[in-house]
Amino acid sequence: MSDNWIVQNLNSALNTWNEKLAEIWTLLTQSPESFKGGDIWNVTTGINGALTAIGYGLLVLFFAAGIVKTCGSFTDMKKPEHALKAFIRFALAQGAIMYGMELMTALFSIVQGIVSTIMAQSGMTNGGATELPAEIVEKIEAVGMLESIPLWIVTLLGSLLITVLSFIMILTVYGRMFKLYMYTAIAPIPISTFAGEPSQSVGKNFIKSYAGVCLEGAIIALACIIFSVYSASPPAIGDTSLSAVTIVWNYIGELVFNLLVLVGAVKASDRIVKEMMGL
């Protein structure tokens, strides 16, 4: 472990990146029930239960509105095929509200299985670690006092960029987890729209959107795996006869570009899912 301040600063930024990358892998394999000890999940299920009663009320409202919209007269409603169709729709919508939590949990478990399979097949458990090459360390340690001033500025800028990218990436993954909680909490309201034929599109969009949020985990896992393979070889040092400032600047520039590729892929996971699946 080098005692050089510049080396320590760069290592600290890289450690932050590695920690956030490892945290992403943990979050992707964690269920909402176990996240942060399950306290958020308990609050979410409580809200879901409270909104279920409102969902039943809206169920009747959407059902009645659907009957009025689809049946031109009371005579149409008395037809057996119309009455049976309306009854089946009402029963299915009621069941969806009653077992909505179980249905959403099952959908999440299916996608979680996809994520676990992707990770297991890749053979990676923590996304790999980015380390400062020994050649860079030697170059930095050989720098004199005056030459270290511009090197200090370059290192500070690079460390700041790496740290900011680390937090942007992890915030995106945390945002996905929070969206899962919000979808689960509010679920009875949009699900109740299945009771009416004119309003069922709201429920369909809700299910598709929730499936898209779940699938974001698979896209993020793929992005991390591809990045780990892509960045397995550290940025090339280039001409070792160059000054330490130039070498470090080139190294940080290429490293930040690689990190930007991953951050961009992670942040675009929702858009990628929509383009792939139309969700």
Please report, for each region that a protein language model flagged, where it lies by residue.
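Hydrophobic alpha-helical transmembrane segments
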Residues: A53-A65, L161-I162, L180
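Alpha-helical membrane-interface segments at transmembrane helix boundaries
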Residues: T44-T52, L84-I88, L92, E141, ...
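Alpha-helical transmembrane segments and their helix-start/interface "positive-inside/aromatic belt" motifs
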Residues: M1-L10, P80-G100, G203-C214, S269
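Non-cytosolic segments of integral membrane proteins
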Residues: A93-I186, I220, C224-G278
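Hydrophobic transmembrane alpha-helix segments characteristic of membrane transport
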Residues: L58-Q94, I186-Q200
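Alpha-helical transmembrane segments
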Residues: I191-K208, I272-M276
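Binding/recognition "hotspot" determinant
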Residues: M1-L58
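Loop-to-transmembrane-helix entry motif
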Residues: I47-I54, F90-Q94, L171-Y174, Y181, ...
